[in-house]
């Protein structure tokens, strides 16, 4: 049975990535696309690379008839999703790609996002969408909150190590490099080619990045006590991709073994042989995560390197993986695409 899909916010990068992936999904059909500022336009006018697809024209959200929609992806900006989702039919399954429902604690949300949550009841209802760790909850959910792309990368490297008890919880450092598409499609001076090309810089440093809220929430939940990591992201002049260097105190072989055992049966998680390190070029355009482990020159320390595509596994691909579960499908359906290389 083919499921009818609506994509709200289809004129942004994550919306376009959803369209690209769903276009070849055997059990999903796009029946509605929204882009309020581009309503009435064809997707080919907004994204010429989608020209060959037979897609509905962009509409305003209030113009969409949701009575025939089985699931909606909400790829709207942060803070916008709250009001929009609150106005959607209560029986509609929703995967939200914004930050609006990732944090369960209203006080934590206000701390990291600077204002009270506008839909606290939905915040309580939402299930955190890190698929490999919340499958059962996602299957039963009506509303799933997509993870932050940086938060997902760090968690794939660290969660199994906390679960296995093989690292010091008080000494975790995440040094992360992210592609520019993670900043969205809107025009920003610091994202102009001349400003970004041939350089890289740290941003939201000193414990100010909002994805720290997700790390705090998830790692503390696993450990059963507060866990705070040090995390600094860097913007790099590549379109797609995230690479996280994670420094931990723990036996390198035990770290590698914990990751290998945890992800042994996972379709999209690949732990490389000990000593081999992954590259963003090897996962570009795919839903795969590659993880490598090496020992440090300091005895009893290890470095874990994780890479994923921020637009795919870090956002739209994982959203589809979650939607598959919510719709009773094989979670990997439509997502077994080989990475794009070179």
From Swiss-Prot:
List the record's Gene Ontology CC terms alphabetically: cytoplasm
The active site lies at: 149
Query: What are the record keywords, sorted?
Result: Amino-acid biosynthesis, Arginine biosynthesis, Cytoplasm, NADP, Oxidoreductase
* Superkingdom of the organism of origin: Bacteria
- Which Gene Ontology BP annotations are present? L-arginine biosynthetic process
Give the matching InterPro entries: AGPR_type-1, NAD(P)-bd_dom_sf, NAGSA_dehydrogenase, Semialdehyde_DH_NAD-bd
The reaction(s) catalysed by this protein are:
N-acetyl-L-glutamate 5-semialdehyde + phosphate + NADP(+) = N-acetyl-L-glutamyl 5-phosphate + NADPH + H(+)
GO molecular function term, any single one:
NAD binding
State which Enzyme Commission number(s) the record gives.
1.2.1.38
Tell me the pathway: Amino-acid biosynthesis; L-arginine biosynthesis; N(2)-acetyl-L-ornithine from L-glutamate: step 3/4
Read off the CDD domains from this record. Answer: AGPR_1_C, AGPR_1_N
Write down the top EC class of this protein: oxidoreductase
Subcellular location field: Cytoplasm
Statement: the UniProt record of this protein carries the keyword Cell membrane: no
Q: Which residues form the signal peptide?
A: none
The record's Pfam families line, in alphabetical order, gives: Semialdhyde_dh, Semialdhyde_dhC_1
What's the family?
A: Belongs to the NAGSA dehydrogenase family. Type 1 subfamily.
What the protein does comes down to: Catalyzes the NADPH-dependent reduction of N-acetyl-5-glutamyl phosphate to yield N-acetyl-L-glutamate 5-semialdehyde.
Q: Which NCBIfam families does this UniProt record tie to the protein?
A: argC (TIGR01850)
Q: What is this protein called in UniProt? A: N-acetyl-gamma-glutamyl-phosphate reductase
Name its species.
Cereibacter sphaeroides (strain KD131 / KCTC 12085) (Rhodobacter sphaeroides)
Q: Which gene encodes it?
A: argC
């Amino acid at each position: 049975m083919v499921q009818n899909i609506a994509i709200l916010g289809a004129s942004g990068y994550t919306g376009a990535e959803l369209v690209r992936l769903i276009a070849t999904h055997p059990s999903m059909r796009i029946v509605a696309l929204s882009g309020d500022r581009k309503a009435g336009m064809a997707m080919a006018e907004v994204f010429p690379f989608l020209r060959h697809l037979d897609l509905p024209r962009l509409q305003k959200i209030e113009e969409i008839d949701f009575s025939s929609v089985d699931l909606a992806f909400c790829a709207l900006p942060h803070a916008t999703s709250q009001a929009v989702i609150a106005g959607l039919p209560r029986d509609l399954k929703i995967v939200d790609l914004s930050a609006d429902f990732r944090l369960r604690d209203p006080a934590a949300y206000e701390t990291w996002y600077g204002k009270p949550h506008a839909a606290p009841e939905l915040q309580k209802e939402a299930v955190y969408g890190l698929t490999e760790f919340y499958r059962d909850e996602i299957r039963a959910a009506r509303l799933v909150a997509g993870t932050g792309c940086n938060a997902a990368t760090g968690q794939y490297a660290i969660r199994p190590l906390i679960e296995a008890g093989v690292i010091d919880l008080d000494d975790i450092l995440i040094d992360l490099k992210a592609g520019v598409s993670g900043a969205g499609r809107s025009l920003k001076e610091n994202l102009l080619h001349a400003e970004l090309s041939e350089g890289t810089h740290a941003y939201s440093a000193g414990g100010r990045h909002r994805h720290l809220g997700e790390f705090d929430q998830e790692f503390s939940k696993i450990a059963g006590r507060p866990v705070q990591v040090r995390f600094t992201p860097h913007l790099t002049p590549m379109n797609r991709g995230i690479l996280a260097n994670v420094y931990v105190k723990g036996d390198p072989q035990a770290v590698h073994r914990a990751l290998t055992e945890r992800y042994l049966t996972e379709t999209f998680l690949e732990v490389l042989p000990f000593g081999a390190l992954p590259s963003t070029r090897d996962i570009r355009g795919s839903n795969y995560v590659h993880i490598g482990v090496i020992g440090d020159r300091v005895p009893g320390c290890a470095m874990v390197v994780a890479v994923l595509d921020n637009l795919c596994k870090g956002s739209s691909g994982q959203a589809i993986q979650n939607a598959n579960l919510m719709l009773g499908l094989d979670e990997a359906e439509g997502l077994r695409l080989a990475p794009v290389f070179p």
